[in-house]
Amino acid sequence: MQNTPLKQRPLRRHLASLLVAGAAVALFPVAAWAQSTSAGEAPKVRLSTSMGDIVLELYPDKSPKTVENFLQYVRDKHYDGTVFHRVINNFMIQGGGFTADFQQKATRPSIPLEASNGLKNDRGTIAMARTQNPNSATAQFFINVVDNAALNAPNPDGYGYAVFGKVTAGMDVVDKIKLVPVGNQGMHQNVPKTPLTILKATLEK
């Protein structure tokens, strides 16, 4: 990631923040985003958060392994009680890995990267966070709050970040989350000063 030519240094710093926090700290215009999957077939997941509900439509035709992985974590209630632990306005909000007291949750084995699927890291899309190893995504995800072309395959490190769905309701909630005050907590940066909790993640269809 570090050798990718980017126009703005702040964005380069933000790219580093998409590393999945782990043992060593590991990462749209909604209505206009065209997809090949019909709305009737796409699974939907509701994230009930402490700031309101966010509904995600997922695309198993484009990112089959990523979607099944995410849905299994939902079925296992992995996300219930986790927080958005990294929030950067004009970039993304990231969650799915920690409880409010920053206890890291156990995960299943990592999945292969599916970033070259034609889906873009546009505003309102959801993608998997990972380490510098492209095939290291487990449970952590992020929602893009702006169009982040620098994250699309093969950028920023020759691989890109795998988009697997988009927000179809609750983008106003995402926009509230992106504006919360943040600070440092231990080795973690851009941590909301008040925990933003995913109370429950449920499969709607």
Explain the meaning of each model-derived region.
Residues Q2-P10, S17, G22, L27-K205:
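Cyclophilin-like peptidyl-prolyl cis-trans isomerases
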